[in-house]
Regions:
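Surface-exposed acidic/polar loop and edge beta-strand patches at domain peripheries
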Residues: 1-166, 172, 176-230, 238-353
């Protein structure tokens, strides 16, 4: 799968970089869109992340990249929030028919450079806030580093029985305009796309009812469940469904388990949550309802069939006095028997799994 994917992208003029960390993890980096398109365990050709089926052949990839639609290659991407400010040109009209992904953001104009520690992606862009009626010039940088198996010293986990891949992602957002307070409120937004038909877990410090952004109307009653320390979201329904959890409640981890052949895979995102920060993303119809750090979106529609784990970084710009913010997170991915994967999930996420 890895070699075929690289060959297909090369054939349609999309350059890639295959970066290997010290533990043998391989990351397929696609500058077009600033994506970490693939995460591969040592010796494995199977991607832990979702890629668009249009990339399965040169012919379909050529057609896809020639279209005027938003081109979602897949993998892990970085956007900016609040969504309602930057993705709705006709605000306050927030009808989904008017939704528009700013092309300066995605695919953007990312440049890849090699550093002493690995690779770095940089995108400079101008973007308009349709709600704030302010424009801002930004710089987004992304670089990767190793992330050793967090359970490598845990004797209770059968390390040799599983495949592991992981990396650290260092992302920065910088306002290039002279006065950051003249800029709109803007924050980093991380979105990781994974194969559909799995179950997502958000550990919490106490019981909470997730905010439903859209969907989850005619879905089975067990699709979304909460307990004292965990939110569970089965991502298998048709359509698009999204939830969010406030920063003060979340632990800074999200996990997702999905079947793959006769095995199961677990992906965990480990990130820093600062409840004192200004989490700017809001539900589309309630633009003052702030404070959500952690989100999840199930997509089974014309955009593809994938599950997203999402997190936000406190905003900079208007009213904050901040010009720059740097975020550091880890992605840990495991593949093995269902028993082993659930044991790892209980260790890293919640005993309730």
């Amino acid at each position: 799968m890895l070699r075929e994917l690289i060959a297909t992208l090369k054939a349609v003029g999309k350059s890639t970089e295959l970066h290997q960390t010290d533990d043998g993890t391989r990351l397929l980096i696609l500058p077009y869109g600033g994506r970490i398109l693939g995460v591969f365990a040592p010796g494995s050709e199977e991607n832990f992340l979702w890629t668009n089926s249009a990339l399965n052949s040169v012919e379909s990839a050529q057609t896809y990249y020639a279209s005027d639609d938003w081109q979602n290659s897949g993998g892990d991407r970085t956007w900016v929030a609040p969504e309602v400010d930057f993705f709705f040109p006709k605000f306050p009209n927030v009808d989904i028919a008017g939704y528009w992904q700013p092309r300066s953001l995605d695919p953007g104009n990312y440049e890849l450079t090699k550093t002493n520690h690995g690779v770095k992606l940089t995108n400079r862009l101008n973007i308009e806030g349709f709600r704030s009626k302010k424009r801002v010039e930004l710089e987004i940088t992304k670089s990767v580093a190793a992330a050793p198996n967090p359970l490598r010293y845990d004797a209770a986990i059968r390390i040799d029985a599983i495949e592991y891949a992981g990396h650290t992602l260092l992302t920065s957002l910088r306002i290039l305009d002279p006065d950051p307070n003249d800029a709109p409120l803007v924050g980093l937004w991380s979105l990781t796309q994974m194969p559909h038909q799995g179950e997502l877990f958000i550990p919490t410090y106490s019981r909470t009812e997730p905010r439903i952004y859209f969907g989850l109307v005619d879905t089975p009653p067990d699709e979304l469940a909460t307990s004292d320390r965990l939110v569970r979201f089965k991502m298998r329904a048709a359509g698009e469904h999204k939830i969010g959890v406030r920063a003060a409640i979340t632990t800074g981890r999200i996990g997702y388990i999905y079947p793959t052949g006769n095995q199961h895979a677990l992906i965990v995102r480990n990130f820093f949550v600062n409840p004192s920060g200004e989490y700017a993303d809001v539900p589309w119809t309630e633009p003052e309802d702030r404070g959500y750090s952690t989100q999840a979106c199930s997509v089974n529609s014309r955009w593809g069939m994938f599950s997203e784990m999402e997190y936000h970084v406190p905003a900079i710009g208007e009213g904050t006095g901040l010009r720059q913010i740097v975020d550091r997170s880890q992605l840990w991915a495991f593949r093995g028997s269902r028993e082993d994967i659930e044991k790892i999930a209980r260790a890293l996420l919640s005993y309730e799994i």
